[in-house]
């Protein structure tokens, strides 16, 4: 499954790069950095009005609570996600307002944390368990990019949409045998960017 996703993304990137001789941008989403998730994105111009963005992020960290306490547990927010987006620019590419159509796919291993509006986040149930699974979906976004120089810009965007989540449930944040499995439908915010943009050409 992962191999197929990587191959598909690679083909899309190759097509996008071949489709333009204008600009290629390398980006880092500072909003994603704020939740301690390293990320990068390549965005390719496809003519005068369209670009194709390819954000990916990966978090493999475990945030330990006080190991000396009897109720010691682990808080983890491990996941990876790919979120490609086709953008339409009202002015020129990489300048001003844009609308985006994005998809997303990823994998998670989350424990000891509440995620609003997702899964079983009722009466603090979710933070007492661990969840492993996959998610996929898509949405729409709107954003704006300020040109800082010939080589850099600053981008802001917000998006909302849908995600289908398939998960296994475990009894504690750290260990245990699977006790349940489920599916969830999420509708709400799916994208937020505060990105520094660097142009290769």
Language model segments and positions:
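Membrane-embedded beta-strand positions of outer-membrane beta-barrel proteins
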Residues: 26-30, 42, 54-56, 84-86, ...
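Outer-membrane beta-barrel "beta-signal"
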Residues: 89, 186-201
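Solvent-exposed loop/turn segments connecting transmembrane beta-strands
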Residues: 25-41, 59, 93
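Bacterial Sec-dependent N-terminal signal peptides
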Residues: 1-24, 196, 200
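Hydrophobic, lipid-facing positions within transmembrane beta-strands of outer-membrane proteins
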Residues: 24, 36-40, 80-84, 136-140, ...
